[in-house]
């Protein structure tokens, strides 16, 4: 047994034959000059490659010098690749969540490109005083939707959170059970409502909710009637949901706020273009919604954003809430959204703007 131990101890560790970091970089510089990477970056990459090889030494035979060199070059080149890459959407799903949702129109990309230097993000150019970054977008949304006021946050889930936090914290929000949706990434509407500080009151059943269900649930603590458009699924057959107009009738004479979460949202009637119909923002407001919220990066075709429109007194409360600053959008998204919304100002040339065309 003593001989056996001596033989095992005398067996050389193959990892000792691995090249040093310095020698590896010298060979790399001579064979594959990569001037775009600093010496420190090359050292870090070489260390990662060698550490990975050492960690797997008990498996397959160790790679030779040339293979190690190729791994190092690949490691460095991967540093130069952006995390987001251009792809061709061959899925058949136009608004694909994992592929970036809507394709931005050329007008939006051109507008963003102009922001190479400083810009009038939050300044009144006439007075030189601080302004509101959403003033331009608000003006466009007022003209397009007929709303009294509007503001923008970074996505529609954020819009839901902000609206309920500003208008319903500590109070009850009534929602149909058939509209308690789950969106991408396992984020559920009841969880968003809980984070807002509002108290969820469920009414009706999964497939059927009647006006009387809302009326019977209203108490002195009720503040919001919330309608949610289930954009990512449909319940068909033996069903009944309460419309925005019916909810508006229910809240008549009561100190309640009707909030309509349209999800994808539409600023034009898609049926006129041979597409499946979706509730429009204008229709929601005409039906009596006090506040409507929807995504800017789906049917509208703009950047990721959550758009909130409605009565001015409620939009002002929403805009002044502390969460509004935490959820606000940056200059690039704001500019791209503004350029996209301008395409909706002329319905007669809407098809020519390309917003209903599919781009690869």
What are these regions (language model features)?
Residues 1-7:
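Short, Lys/Arg-enriched N-terminal segments with co-localized hydrophobic residues
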Residues 8-77:
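Long amphipathic alpha-helical segments
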Residues 18-19, 37, 88-92, 300-303:
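Short Gly/Ser/Thr- and Asp/Glu-enriched loop/turn motifs at secondary-structure junctions
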Residues 46-47, 51, 90-91, 101-126:
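Glycine-rich phosphate-binding segment of PLP-dependent enzymes
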Residues 59-104, 108-111:
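Long amphipathic N-terminal alpha/beta scaffold segment
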Residues 79-90, 118-130, 149-150:
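Short, flexible active-site-proximal loops enriched in glycine and acidic residues
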Residues 125-344:
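Conserved PLP-enzyme active-site core in the AAT-like
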Residues 344-360:
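Structural signature of PLP-dependent enzymes
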């Amino acid at each position: 047994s003593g001989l056996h131990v001596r033989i095992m101890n005398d067996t050389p560790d193959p990892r000792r034959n691995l090249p040093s970091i310095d020698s590896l970089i010298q060979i790399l510089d001579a064979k594959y000059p990569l001037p775009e990477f600093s010496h420190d970056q090359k050292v870090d990459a070489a260390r990662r490659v060698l550490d990975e090889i050492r960690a797997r030494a008990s498996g397959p035979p160790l790679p030779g010098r040339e293979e190690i060199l190729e791994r190092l070059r690949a490691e460095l080149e991967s540093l130069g690749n952006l995390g987001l890459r251009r792809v061709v959407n061959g899925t058949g799903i136009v608004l694909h969540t994992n592929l970036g949702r809507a394709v931005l129109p050329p007008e939006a990309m051109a507008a963003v490109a102009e922001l190479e230097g400083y810009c009038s993000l939050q300044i009144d150019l006439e007075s030189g005083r601080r302004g509101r970054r959403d003033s331009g977008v608000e003006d466009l949304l007022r003209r397009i939707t007929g709303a009294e006021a509007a503001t923008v946050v970074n996505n529609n889930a954020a819009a839901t959170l902000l609206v309920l936090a500003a208008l319903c914290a500590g109070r009850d929000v009534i929602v149909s059970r058939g509209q308690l949706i789950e969106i991408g990434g396992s984020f559920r509407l009841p969880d968003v409502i809980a984070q807002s500080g509002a108290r969820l009151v469920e009414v009706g059943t999964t497939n059927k909710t009647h006006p009387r269900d809302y009326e019977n649930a209203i108490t002195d603590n009720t503040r919001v009637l919330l309608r949610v458009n289930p954009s990512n699924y449909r319940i068909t057959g033996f069903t009944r949901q309460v419309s925005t107009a019916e909810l508006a009738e229910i809240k008549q004479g009561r100190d309640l706020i009707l909030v309509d979460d349209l999800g994808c949202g539409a600023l034009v009637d898609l049926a006129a273009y041979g597409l499946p119909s979706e509730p429009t923002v204008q229709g929601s407001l005409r039906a009596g919604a006090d506040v409507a919220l929807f995504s800017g990066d789906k049917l509208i075709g703009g950047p990721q954003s959550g758009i909130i429109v409605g009565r001015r007194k409620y939009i002002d409360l929403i805009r002044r809430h502390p969460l509004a600053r935490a959820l606000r959008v940056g200059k690039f998204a704001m500019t791209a959204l503004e350029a996209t919304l301008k395409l909706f100002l002329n319905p007669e040339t809407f098809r020519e703007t390309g917003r209903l065309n599919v781009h690869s």
